[in-house]
Amino acid sequence: MKEATMYYIGVMSGTSLDGVDLALMDFSCAQPQLIHADFYPMPPAIRQQISTLCNSGTTTLQALGELDHQLGLLYTDCIQQFLQKHRLSPEQITAIGCHGQTVWHSPNSHYPFTMQIGDANLIAAKTGITTVADFRRKDMAFGGQGAPLVPAFHQALFRKPNQATVVLNVGGISNISRLLPNEEVIGYDTGPGNTLLDAWIEKHQGKAYDKNAEWAKSGKVNTDLLADLLDEPFFALPAPKSTGRELFNLAWLNKKLQKHTALLPQDVQATLVELTAQSIVDQLNQIETELDRHLLVCGGGVKNCLLMARLTALLPQWQVQTTNDYGLDADYVEAAAFAWLAYQRLNDLPGNLPSVTGAKSAVSLGAIYPKEKDVAA
């Protein structure tokens, strides 16, 4: 691989808690290029700690601090494996953009805040690579929701002058970026993506996810439960809006199920797929345009064939594709986005879109942790 100063590594672990995505991006050309990408499973013990924290909202300072340290070490280990696998030296990488792990996101509280953990000091010290992290709080300091941040990257890569493009990311939470010509970009969370599906099958079958949606396909959608789920006030909020596991979790689902105790677990799973699909479709149906409509899907939800089939069936006016068709692996769009955000930060360029987050202005995002190699690392 050539020597370069335009290689950036993006590191992302999302609300699905399945693992850590790494993407090596090259920004030396007008069109950013994904060079390598890999996935590293989340260790079960760390996954459980994060899940418990997100679902309960309570912990001790000791436990939170130790989890912050553990995640910093985990990200470091993933990066070092990635460098070794692809025969890269730290000197070839300009910077790492590490999102961290969101454990709480509360943009509408009296004192708005968001918390991502995974100590970037450890990453910079042990890799010897400048690291950019803490991307969301600067946007919130300027009055924004702190999310979603990826639409700015979507705009840079996917916006076209002659078509209505929407990028749909289905991770733990689903979010869309509306990229319409001659309009401000709008991007926001639509509701749950995989998080409820994964939590429900883990509870009943001990599996991390519903492979090929086989369990969901064995069930039937319960329209009464679906109506109760869609009655959640979040779905009626105007954009921009953001949400996370602090709302859509097993506690929320169990409360909704109190009126539906006779349902089979697989019927609940089928209904949760429909919830994800319907909450996405409800937002897309608000778009009025005479242009060709293209929906580009990315994230783990691309692998849910039932969800993809439902989106295609419910959106006959849209051409439903994946970002693979546009040259960017659907599994690694978010990781690539945080590499791009690190590039933007080091070049003092904006990383947010006020029309998306609600911030007062476009600003560069992220705190910089300069490379200072720990020789004992």
Curated annotation (Swiss-Prot):
InterPro entries: Anhydro_N_Ac-Mur_kinase (IPR005338), ATPase_NBD (IPR043129). Pathway: Amino-sugar metabolism; 1,6-anhydro-N-acetylmuramate degradation; Cell wall biogenesis; peptidoglycan recycling. ATP binds at G14, T15, S16, L17, D18, G19, V20, D21. Keywords: ATP-binding, Carbohydrate metabolism, Kinase, Nucleotide-binding, Transferase. Its EC number is 2.7.1.170. One of its GO terms (molecular function) is kinase activity. It is an enzyme of class 2 (transferase). Catalyzes the specific phosphorylation of 1,6-anhydro-N-acetylmuramic acid (anhMurNAc) with the simultaneous cleavage of the 1,6-anhydro ring, generating MurNAc-6-P. Is required for the utilization of anhMurNAc either imported from the medium or derived from its own cell wall murein, and thus plays a role in cell wall recycling. GO terms for biological process: 1,6-anhydro-N-acetyl-beta-muramic acid catabolic process; amino sugar metabolic process; peptidoglycan turnover. The keyword ATP-binding applies. It comes from the Bacteria. This is Anhydro-N-acetylmuramic acid kinase. HAMAP family: AnhMurNAc_kinase. Belongs to the anhydro-N-acetylmuramic acid kinase family. It catalyses: 1,6-anhydro-N-acetyl-beta-muramate + ATP + H2O = N-acetyl-D-muramate 6-phosphate + ADP + H(+).
